[in-house]
């Protein structure tokens, strides 16, 4: 992008691709639980539902989230599978649990959102000139995204303040697990966020993941978020 000003292109998985992916499992006698990118963010969910209706035995979950926000539900599903629950029962629980999953992230720059057509040039220029780093929050009721608090300052100070704000806003957070997810960021920032989390709450597990190429291409480097469940 820096050399040619071109971003990778992203596209939703189509119905035929979903059928090709699920059909071998269904034919083998399995029931499939598929946790999809939020329906407000992509047409992939609708395409998956069409494929599932044609195949049968595929339970499609609208995560109302993205990235490791869906990962939270995957962890929950895995635990319920280990407990021996049926696919129908697991799907029902997951659909009820989406509103307990919280996803947000800090953008270091709006340059990449602008390049992908997701914000105006005026907004991008203003944010970059003022050194604003917006917090993007995912609405866990429908998967839509909104701009939350706009932070100003160096990335290290912004990340610490962001962590404190997110945890303060969710006093009923589940302390057993939390994701730190980033699009490619220096290890020192990951360590900083880990220490900020530990200073605020005694998490049993802090798991660091890298965002997928789709998310990263829209957000750009140095994007970082924390993703967790509430009780």
Describe each region flagged by the PLM.
Residues 4, 30, 40-59, 65-231:
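Mixed-charge interfacial surface used for oligomerization/domain docking
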Residues 8-9, 35, 180-181:
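Short, contiguous strand/loop micro-motifs
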Residues 15-45:
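N-terminal glycine-rich phosphate/adenylate-binding segment common to multiple enzyme folds
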Residues 1-17:
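N-terminal glycine-rich anion-binding loop in soluble enzyme alpha/beta folds
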């Amino acid at each position: 992008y820096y050399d040619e000003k071109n971003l990778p292109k992203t596209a939703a998985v189509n119905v035929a691709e979903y059928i090709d992916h699920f059909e071998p499992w269904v034919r083998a006698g399995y029931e499939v639980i598929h946790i999809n990118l939020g329906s407000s963010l992509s047409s992939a969910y609708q395409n998956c539902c069409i494929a599932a209706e044609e195949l049968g035995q595929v339970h499609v979950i609208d995560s109302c989230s993205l990235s490791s926000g869906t990962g939270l539900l995957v962890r929950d599903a895995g635990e319920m599978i280990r407990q021996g629950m049926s696919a129908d029962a697991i799907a029902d629980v997951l659909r009820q649990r989406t509103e307990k999953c919280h996803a947000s992230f800090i953008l270091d720059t709006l340059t990449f959102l602008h390049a992908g057509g997701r914000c105006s040039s005026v907004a991008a220029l203003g944010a970059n000139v003022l050194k604003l780093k917006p917090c993007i929050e995912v609405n866990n009721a429908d998967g839509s995204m909104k701009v939350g608090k706009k932070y100003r300052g160096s990335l290290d100070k912004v990340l610490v303040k962001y962590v404190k704000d997110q945890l303060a806003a969710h006093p009923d957070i589940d302390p057993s697990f939390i994701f730190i997810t980033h699009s490619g960021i220096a290890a020192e920032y990951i360590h900083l966020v880990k220490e900020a989390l530990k200073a605020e709450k005694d998490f049993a597990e802090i798991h660091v993941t890298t965002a997928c190429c789709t998310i990263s291409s829209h957000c750009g480097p140095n994007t970082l978020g924390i993703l967790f469940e509430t009780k």
